[in-house]
Amino acid sequence: GRFSVISQERYLEIEQLECDWKQTDETRFEAKTFAFYCKKEELSFWERYFDLDQDYEAYINSVRKRDSYLQHAAQAGSGIRILNQDPWEMILTFVISQQKTIPKIREAVEALSRQFGTEHRSAVLRGSQEKEITCFPTPSQLAEVSEETLRALKLGYRAKYIVRLCQDAAGGRLNLDALKTMGYEEAMAYLKSFYGIGEKVANCICLFGLHHIEAFPVDTWIEQILMQEYYRKKK
């Protein structure tokens, strides 16, 4: 299939060219054939976005012999990578994600972008076509938005968190440039000092927006797995 990705003012389409499965041992299979469609000058951005310079096979091999559960999880999720996404987009997206399903999160983020983001023409595709995209809104674009307006976008109780975070980011109290330079522990403490960001959301931002791969977000599903596969077995 083919998938579309928007980050900042950039647009990418990524496509699996064929089902090129390769069996590397008794339990592991790989599919590595894919193609990017983007502007040539943006290729390095997307290579970093998809973390293509990291050896994920080495990560998997480091746990394979010690942990049969993670071995099977790695097989099931073969090809998954930790994306280098925009920190501001991740802050709002994971605040929105609280108590929401993935389709509802996508719907809310798209509504926010349509109403407050900037339209932009980007990405030369096949046949020299250009794609018109709507970028995720910046802090300054959202700084004056009211809680009532956000509630109308079905953001519920999260609206009050978003209002405060946008004001903090636009006013400089939430310093995104400084956040990008922080280590994991410092970034966690800094993020949790802001209204609406707790332990799990801060870990999600650190992992997917700041690429601190030591971050470990624990939601209901992860907690169930930990209890079932690890804590209970130790007793």
Where do the model's predicted regions map?
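HhH-family (HhH-GPD) DNA N-glycosylase catalytic core used in base-excision repair
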Residues: 1-235
